[in-house]
Amino acid sequence: AIRRQRQMCIRDSFYDSKKSGGITVSHLRFGSSPITSTYLINKANFVACHNPSYVNKYDMVQDLLPGGTFLLNCIWSPEELDANLPASMKRYIAQNNINFYTINGIKIAEEVGLPGRASTILQSAFFTISGILPVDEAIGYMKEKVVAKFSKKGEAVVNSNCNGIDRGSKEVVKIDVPASWADAKDEENDYEVPTNRPEMKKFVKNILHPVDRLHGDDLPVSAFLDSADGVYPQGSAAFEKRGIAVDVPEWDPTKCAQCNLCSMVCPHAVIRPICMNEEEAAAAPEGTKMIKSKRTDYQYALITSV
């Protein structure tokens, strides 16, 4: 829409190295003259975070220019932001006069019949905030695209997307940043890698976690000396829990047939049936649901690993 209606030059870069649901970082440049920059953006005017779990895992605002705009898709009310945002993010927002907006695109998507598909809603919020195009004009272009793309899927799909576009424009919230955020204090992080293998602890702490947080380019060559021959400790996938799901399914023991088919078809081994003896059941984490196994004397539980 920007390129077509304003005769602007556009350059974009999208990259996702993981499987379905992995993080995708999109870099978009546009302007009235040809764009010759071949590098990723590190001084942005606008940054949007589409998944609230990313705020505690990645540096979401550090590439924003002072006075830039940050849009966060989250389920938190303005009053709940202080308790849920990391101190480093709050400091940067306050100290650099960042224009901070939130929108509950997750709730909107569910209510308009597009669960898990908030991208159109957030795009509408982007045009509303940025002022790149007049809001009514931008929304009109978006709806034209929706009709052209989804008309074959029926009127209901078209209406759901159009309703999402309207609500994305109307329900974005401007946050008044508290002055206290400028002095937000970091909490102590005493995370201990849960393994008794010294080489794995070192690998996870020095390489795996920094790479997972997109800080791999900051690692010195010395960090890889123990793996100079290209050999890495096996079993490291257990420490790559991304924790990015907004919603996690809950097992209902009253409706479970203990067939374990759900575990068999789960592609990521997230659903895990477990049988426990009395001692193991007593030592299970607080709140663990369990029932008597139909086939043994053990206690049966279906655990969701996230």
Locations of regions flagged by a protein language model:
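Solvent-exposed alpha-helices and their adjacent loops that cap or buttress functional pockets
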Residues: 17-22, 38-42, 62-64, 91-95, ...
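Ferredoxin-type iron-sulfur electron-transfer modules and their immediate structural context
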Residues: 138-139, 151-306
